Amino acid sequence: MMDGFFASAVVQNALLIGGAAAALSGVIGVFTVLRGQSFAGHALADVSSSGGALAVLLGISPMAGFFGLGLLGGLGLGQRRRADSDLAAGIMLGAGLGCTALLLHFAVSQRGVAGAAVTIMFGSLFAAPPGAGGWALGGALAGLLLIACLYRPLLLASLSEELAALRGAKVKLLGVLFLVMLALSVTLSAMSVGAILSTALLIGPAATALRLTRRPAAAMALAAVLGMACAWGGVALAYASYSWTPGRVWPVSFFITACVLLSYVIAAWRKG
């Protein structure tokens, strides 16, 4: 059933992308929950989907499109006060999905890319370009390095902007940098489970980890491990599903999100 699993170049690429996305999303997700910006993460995912659709239409790498539009969305949200960000995120979410629908229509009708909608919105790890794994790993390492450099002031600003400002932290700049890192995280998640489901990989492991520990550093490490376990478990189950329904593979994104949900339910049950 699992013959040739680790020997497959496609599987290796999927494991690399999924693991990189999950590690960064787990860490960023804890900050996102602490800052109360889960909705902003969802909005950036939908905005980035229009970038992915545009990339398909132009025949360039979807990862570049996802990150480009996600970055613009993050910079746009960064200009707003956190209290006003939900309103801006809601408008951005609707606009992003509308643009995605239009661009996917052109991608299908003009370029004949029939599977573009499924790939952009729900992900297709096994169809990722061969070099995408290296780019995903590099992006995740860059994001984690930036988080390590900004950890203390960013954590303080996430818990209390007023206290962080009194301590001399540049709260506005930290907010913008956080949204840039969030855009990068959403980009990698969208490559794994698609734009619509990327919030599950961003918020699910983080919420689970925060149920099990209240120490931020421990929660980030746990969220990264949980996310990677869900991503790799999802890839393994999708690979195994080929023998369940011969000739057809179940979506990787389904198994990843199912693992995320199961881990959260188990954590909630254990905490009573």
What residues fall within each predicted segment?
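Transmembrane helix-bundle core of multi-pass membrane transporters
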Residues: 91-150
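Membrane-interfacial amphipathic/re-entrant helices at transmembrane-helix boundaries
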Residues: 1-22
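Membrane-interface capping segments at transmembrane-helix boundaries
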Residues: 152-155, 268-272
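Hydrophobic alpha-helical segments embedded in the membrane of multi-pass proteins
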Residues: 23, 27, 45-50, 94-95, ...
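Loop-to-transmembrane alpha-helix initiation sites
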Residues: 14-17, 61-68, 86-90, 137, ...
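Membrane-interface helix termini and inter-helical loops of multi-pass transporters
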Residues: 1-7, 110-128, 237-248
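Helix-loop-helix "hairpin" substructures at the membrane interface of multi-pass membrane proteins
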Residues: 133-205
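Short loop segments and helix-boundary regions at transmembrane helix junctions
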Residues: 30-111, 209-224, 237, 241-249, ...
